[in-house]
Amino acid sequence: MASISLSRQPALSTAELEQITSVWKAPGLFATLISVFCAFGGWTLLLPVIPLTVIQHGGSESLAGLSTGVFMGATVLTQAFTPWLIRVVGYPAVMAGAGIMLGLPALVYLVDMSPPVLLGIAVLRGMGFGAVTVAESALIAELVPRRLMGNSSAALGTAVGVAQLISFPLGLWLLNSHGQAWVFSVAAIYAVVGSAAAWWIPYQSKARKADQDALLADATAARSADNLEVSAAPIPAATWKLAAVPGLAIGAIATGFAAFSTFLAPAVEAIDLTVAALISAAGLSVLGGMQMLGRIIAGRYTMKRGEAGHLAGIGLGCGITGLILAGILIALAPVGIPLVAGAFAAAGIFGLGFGLVQNEALLMLFERLPNEKTTLASALWNMTFDSGTGIGAILLGIAASAFAFQQAFWIAACIGTFALCVVIADRVVGRRRLRGTAKPAPAAG
């Protein structure tokens, strides 16, 4: 492996980028991974803690779900204009500022966690999360040649997975052992470190922008030079058509993630308090670890096949299975070791599918959209992901309040089943893609 340095390096031109033989030689990738690790570490740290704290302080399941939903709503709205923001101020400023917004406002919860403050801080943190998620997903395509994108996406998945593997149990352990002050302080530390690392991410070089402008000019001239070829060429499909299937897949699996992250902890507390802390902490850690494995598998498989999407259906199937098992487990309400084993199994199976679908959907969007729409592809992936998480948390919270926790998991499984049917249909009858800019798919390098 090439030596890794955090020293600031200029971005590479297109020609220089194509000479890279390893993702670890890409300037700025390691700094990006550190920033991503801290962003997702801080987010994951508080993800199960805030809903659980709301319920422990007398709030309803609906309010707990609403806090997640408002966070994700702000996230999605921010993601819509993040590509523009990146063009204006660059990746380093976006990543650094977003990291601060994601972590530091949570310190206000030490003073006040009333509903207005709870939801107001959720909006601020959601804005930070929205910007950082779009930027980091786009960077894995910007910093490496397209043939190595499977490896860079696997590296990104590893950073996210390790962050979740550590932070899921850490947040709940800190809450139970030391109280809220420790949890929110650690989230603030994550924010500061991640923001500092972001300043070592290179700006896109002028040479790179000139290369892209030249390619666009050449393509325009070529189309103008031969009207017959233009007439015979396929009309590019609308962006929403190209993005619909991967967007539905990630949105559906994210709804299932909302069920696990928001309602697993209170559900097991209602069944057996003696093992609730273990399941709440380690169960989500198992989910994060298997998610990391799924993203690595999907990235490597795409590198070998040269095309993304082959494992999307399998991933959704695993996610559906995990949700159904979790619902059955909560309905049967076993205690002790059976409850622990069942929760770990359900979380692990879901996590594997979650990771597979995450990676497949992102690479499918990068493949289907033109090169100049890399940040748009990243924004669409993140918007559908976080819409699924946010809307899922709200709707499943209503279901949990009106019926029972298991209903939330089963409803999420039904949504996943619909997405699976669409993905299968897409693989069978949707092989031919109409795209505006031809480009090679990721291939083994």
Describe every region a protein language model picked out.
Residues S7-A26, S205-P246, P442-G445:
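Juxtamembrane intracellular "pre-TM" segments in multi-pass secondary transporters
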Residues G309-Q358:
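C-terminal transmembrane helical hairpin of 12-TM major facilitator-type secondary transporters
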Residues V23-G65, F257-V268:
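Helix-loop boundary and gating motifs at the non-cytosolic
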Residues V123-V160:
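Cytoplasmic helix-loop-helix junction between adjacent transmembrane helices
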Residues T78-G90, G294-E307:
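Helix-to-loop junctions at the C-terminal end of transmembrane segments
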Residues V88-A98, M303-G317:
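Cytoplasmic membrane-interface "Motif A"-like loop-to-helix N-cap segments
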Residues F184-W199, F409-A425:
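Symmetry-related core transmembrane helices of the 12-TM Major Facilitator Superfamily/SLC fold
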Residues M72-A80, Q164-L165, G288-I296, G390:
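Residue-level signature of mid-helix packing/kink "hotspots" within the transmembrane helices
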